[in-house]
Amino acid sequence: MTKPLSSVNLHQLVQQVITEQRHSSILCAPKVIQEGVYDPGILKAVFTAGGPGSGKSYLADVVFGVRTAKDKPFFENASFIGSNGLKYVNSDRFFERELGKLGINPKDLRDIADLPSDELWDIVQSADEPESARNVAKGYLESLRNLYEKGRLGMLIDGTGGKYDKMVREKSLADAMGYDTYMLFVDTSLPVAIERDAKRDRTLGPQLVEEIWQNVQDNKERFKELFGDNFAVVENSVYGPPPQEVIKSLNNFV
């Protein structure tokens, strides 16, 4: 007489049978996986670097063919870039939304920074205040970026490149997740950067613009070494279409 199975052994047997059936169905009726590493944009991360007013977002739109030089910024109305499917990673729109909730016009940020009291500035920008508009915006962006990374979706990571160590960390993390990385460095002269900043809604002022611009310039050669062949510089002191070789290089990359 066969000895009855214990509840534990019975559970293990059922699991084994189910597993074997699953494996058998896969072998007998295999399905073609539609997604892969060769899909446009998949596992591609394009970093931008450039000081205030350099036109990084403008150039990215033109490079990937989602607008001409005369069109309005594409990234204001969408979270992806054209047929390549790259996702924009930029906290600006979230930050401006939080400013709107506070009833603050972005044009007033510089005046707020100059106030004798730091109370209002802390509400807007303080890194130590968890509920500041800037930190809330960064939180939204981090959640969105985590979602993109889990799906290994392609990303355009918009930044100034003013902090070299931060860029090294971000690139290393992307590399570890299997991403191929590229940097688009957008260059302008300091006078042009200051002039353009003065015309922006969120002006930084000449002193801060010069500080950031210099930090970015100091990192330029190091970025070139860090990214190797996947590094392109566009001189954008005069607005215009980027060189065709840059457009071709980036589109071939993604």
Walk through the language-model features, giving the residues of each.
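Pre-Walker A adenine-sensing motif
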Residues: 29-39
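Short hydrophobic/aromatic beta-strand immediately N-terminal to the Walker A/P-loop
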Residues: 45-47
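The conserved Walker
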Residues: 51-52
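Conserved lysine of the Walker
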Residues: 56
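Hydrophobic positions on the alpha1 helix immediately C-terminal to the Walker A/P-loop
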Residues: 59
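Conserved substrate/cofactor phosphate-moiety recognition/catalytic segment
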Residues: 63-151, 165
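Conserved GTP-binding G-domain of TRAFAC-class P-loop NTPases and closely related GTPase folds
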Residues: 66, 70, 83, 190-254
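Conserved phosphate-donor/acceptor-positioning beta-strand/loop module used by diverse small-molecule
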Residues: 162, 175-196
